[in-house]
Amino acid sequence: RRRRKQPVRRALVAWVAATDALPILSSLIGALSRDNGPELMYLYMWLFWAWIVTVPPRLAFYAFNFVNLRRTGYVAACAFVLFALWGTTRGRTSIRVNRVEICSDRIPEAFDGFRFVQITDMHVGTLVRPERELTRLADSVNAQRPEAVFFTGDLVNIRAGELDERTTALLRRIAGPVWSVTGNHDVGTYIKDSLRFPAAGEAREVVARQRAMGWTVLEDTTVYLRRG
């Protein structure tokens, strides 16, 4: 029996060591990679997913098992795995609309009933299913029947190439005038290979591709809206 259990134990030890080493592996890949484009970001995402569904559940089991609550440990570990799976699938892509009524004496009466939508942080370069996710987002925005849409930064994750023709075509589905500003991800802050992809050039390209979609990009600019 001991001999039969040895291969199982060895496999278990190897599995534990491999999953524990995933953060180290990610760090090594990042250190050795010349660039950090979308492909590398996807790899990071999958490595993190593999870690989150293995190591924290195992630690939860260890904690309960330490106080002689093994069954509770199994339940806690399984619950954590299910929660992580939900978070990385349904939870990550769920859209929640928060409706806020703004009342102020500084708002002209002409804007009574004015409806706008504010969206932010799309990070289109790391969407798992861009077509489905951006279509749902556009439909959700359009369903609010806004008179204006404000995008408040971080359209891309790393660089301008993430705004390819397919992505921009999907974003054009957002109805109504769209005003946007750039975020820290949009201006090349996190580009690693800055020789091939200079931050200033990438920032200009992100702005240019937004304007090509019909968006109004505000760069140190003030715009006054008039109604009625």
What are these regions (language model features)?
Residues R1-T93:
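Non-catalytic terminal accessory segments
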Residues A110-G228:
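Soluble catalytic domains of enzymes that build or remodel membrane lipids, polysaccharides, and related
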Residues L59-Y62, F66, D105-I107, I119, ...:
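Generic structural motif
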